[in-house]
Amino acid sequence: MGRLFIYDENMTDERAKITVAKMADISDIVAQEKEYIKYSAKGAVTVSAGSVIAVGEMAVFKTAETVLTKANLDQGADFTHGSDYYIYICDPGTNAQDEVYVISLNSTFPDGEVWDDTNTRKIGGFHYGRVRNTDDYGRPVNTSGSVRGSGWESNTRVDILPNSVWTTKHRPKCDPSGMVYLGNALWGDIYISSDDGANGLQSIYDGTPITGTEGLNWYIAGERARRVGKRLPDYMEFTVAADGSPQGLDASNANGWTATTNKARTAVGKIANAVSSFNICDMAGNVWKWLNELLHDPTGASWAWYDVLGGGYGQAYMANSTGLHALIGGGDWGNGVHCGSRAVNCSSYPWNVAANIGVWCVCDSL
């Protein structure tokens, strides 16, 4: 540790000199607003003007308003459905050149021989996938703009998810990949959770929902969510995030994986209509989702200790052997019209391991 700057009117002491390297050392990202990158048009995001950003040891840039599109990709000609993209500000290496913006699938630094972790800085990102068209209040509309008017269920598009755009200052506490902003300092996964292969969970397009088939119950869902910095939602958080998801159908999977003839879960994010106003997929149907709310069976009368929690986890004092219940939301693959954004089942106990119950996660803002 030592003094970085001193006053020396003769400038003979190196510590008196203000250099780019010193400014880079002390500069974070200084922005007038947390959301210094925003969705601005179909296939485009805009970096706002006036942010000061250090890149590596030799560059400090002040941003101008800049629109970024697929033309900024480091590889490929267009965005890919179901992919997370990362936005980098890059130092081209000479004092005469301004910053360069690159959009990449890589989460470390962009592709290309000239780029590495010394001359690039990740400043944000977004997800490209299914978006539900809404009015200014977030209500689903049909192609004529009528709220829940005829045919509203199919009025979706493939685009940058506007509420998936994140920055270093506007993001969840966890990895922001595969998440959208729900408002009120809360983020939610875009996809029902699948197994990340490391005893945690992930939100990815075309993933297989994790359920009791992989040993999931309410307790394990919470443990896996915690390992990746997330948590289970309560019922209100779930219904808000799921709003705009069409009600299920008995005889069709057009609005979600809900037809009563279905036999099992399916890959997430594949049904065009099955997206909420917050651009979250499969909230109605496919598998039930564990919620962070409990209740007790009011009809029980046989109060006692019940050894139902599994070996080594203690016992539950209840009015019957399944007295404690955990809510599950949304419906599953064969529930038909029972599926929906407010659908709830109050009969499942938290130690239940069921092939039709999965999990969807949220995370608080950083």
Question: Which positions does each model-derived feature cover?
Answer:
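Acidic glycine-/aspartate-rich tracts in secreted/extracellular proteins
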Residues: 91-97, 192-195, 293-296, 333, ...
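Short, surface-exposed terminal/edge motifs of secreted or surface/virion proteins that either
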Residues: 93-110
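Residues within well-ordered beta-strands of beta-sheet-rich folds
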Residues: 86-90, 187-189, 279, 360-364
